[in-house]
Amino acid sequence: MKKGFSIIMAFVTVMTMLFSGVTFADDTNENTESKTKECNFTNLIVFARFSDEDEFVDNEYSGNSVRKITDNSYNNADFNVSDYYETASNGKLHMNSVYLFDKGGSIQLSHPRGYYAEYSDENPEGYTDNGEKSQRMYELKTDWSEAINRAISAGNVITNYDGTKKYNFSELDKNNDGAIDAITIIYKNTTQSISVGWSSPLWNYKDYADYVKINADGKTITSKNYVQVTNSYNYLYKDNRKNVILPMAVATHEMGHILGFKDLYNSSNSSPVYYMSAMAKHMSPVPQFISVKEREAKGWLTSDNVKTIYQNGQYTLKEASTRGDSQIVGYKLNLKGTNKTLYLEYRNFGTGGNK
């Protein structure tokens, strides 16, 4: 990841309040808007509001619009989702997030927000049982999918966050497998009194929906994996260049699911892995690394990075670094008679230590 990210990981607890945001201790002057390597994975971001809600993409928080804060968090700040995975992948994944707007704004869904939430005295239109809940979760997928299809049919194209750069729809399928690499649906933040619980339709989660169909250079590409999130703009952070960003933990964790990583916790919040992976108990605002085992399983680390121990001896292991992995970052030991493997890595979560 870029220099700024490695520094903020070292000083994630050293912050000072600045107006309504937070400024990170950081000394980088690198302009991260200039990507040095060609993208090989595209994340399509679509802002969505419900039928009872007004436009929000240009609402400002700490002097920045929602669309700009989002792009800082995914693409351009000194620490962002794209750079996180470029570093975690050992330089193998180069992600770019692009946008689909409807006449410059968000897509609008056909139902109010409360329709997709649990019934209560304050929300009489909500679902009342698990059957209705499942049906409305399905309806939510088709709701935003159909809104995307309508926006594209109306002539809207994919662009950067402010519409000044256009992209061909073929950019959405970088590996040419006929599927959109990733879709991120970002719902409008809400002040409504609506209950959003674990596994409910409005929860932040990754799922599958194949209802978006796009013609790209004469072939059809289809949606598959997507994530949906609802961001709060109550607590924002700033890098050294005054880029305002969201806490990155949720966006990074959910993107991990798109890439194939599993949750390392359960619904009772039991998390044996705890802070050893961003897929378990992720830190905020900048999440820690995913584990050596996960990165190895993905093919991001090789036998040059994770060495197998075959004999007794003295082995040296340095702290996990955010500056790239050209050296050994872990060891593994096959435990005789157990069909299990013990992974060893050095993670320092103390102040000033790499995460």
Q: What are these model-derived regions, one by one?
A:
Residues 51, 68-76, 87, 150-158, ...:
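Structured segments of extracytoplasmic/periplasmic soluble domains
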Residues 17-34:
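Sec-dependent signal peptide cleavage junction
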Residues 31-69, 189:
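Fold-level signature of zinc-dependent metallopeptidase catalytic domains
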Residues 39-44, 93, 178-183, 274-275, ...:
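Loop/turn elements at helix/coil->beta-strand transitions in domains of secreted/extracellular proteins
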Residues 83-219:
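Active-site-proximal segments of metallohydrolase catalytic domains
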Residues 188-354:
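Extracellular hydrolytic enzyme modules, especially secreted metalloproteases
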Residues 54-102:
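Active-site-surrounding "flap" and adjacent substrate/cofactor-binding loops of secreted or lumenal enzymes
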Residues 1-7:
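Positively charged n-region of N-terminal signal peptides that target proteins for export
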